[in-house]
Amino acid sequence: MTLRIIAHLLALTASLAGCTSTAPIYVEQPTPIFVRQESTVLKLESFHASEQQRLLAFLWKASRGRRDALHLVISGSSRLSAEAVHQARQMGIGASNIHLLDQNDRGHLRIEAVVYHALPPICRSLSSQLLNDEFFDQPIGCSTSHNLAVMINDPRDLLGNRFVKPSDGDRAAIPVTTYRTSTGKGGL
């Protein structure tokens, strides 16, 4: 009887020892996504029909069909800038992507078209011919970063959030304060 209990205890100990591993866990650092900026410049002296066609061709070529990811920096003549902004808005470029700088009454106009490109990280393959210990510890984060870099609409968003302003939480505390003081609707 005791021999059977000892055999069961040894089997239980061996199975529990296999579940607990003292080997260090190596966590691979996340692979960064690199964002590259590409700029092209167009200078216009007037806004005749030929210049307007040059502007439209320039915007189409610079955007590569992705007008929502094209950022324009327009400087120079305020009258020509207004015409260029109007043409860009008609092409579908968002107002938040058009920036006016150094407006004056001089004769020429400078339009800089900026496009951002995300360069996805190079990940090792999850399928391997050799089944070693690292095969089961492949980093999932690298493939997630790769997919994000490939699918993101405007890679400039990876550089930082320019729409949400940082705050100290005072606005978020207003509903809690209202609830605690019972001055809101349904207060007792």
From Swiss-Prot:
It is a lipid-anchor. InterPro entries: Pilus_biogenesis_CpaD-related (IPR019027), Pilus_CpaD (IPR013361). Keywords: Cell membrane, Lipoprotein, Membrane, Palmitate, Plasmid, Signal. It is found in: Cell membrane. A lipid is attached at C19 (S-diacylglycerol cysteine). Residues 1-18 form the signal peptide. It holds the Pfam family Pilus_CpaD. Its main location: membrane. Transmembrane segments: none annotated. A lipid is attached at C19 (N-palmitoyl cysteine). GO terms for cellular component: plasma membrane. The keyword Transit peptide does not apply. This is Uncharacterized lipoprotein y4xK. It comes from Sinorhizobium fredii (strain NBRC 101917 / NGR234).
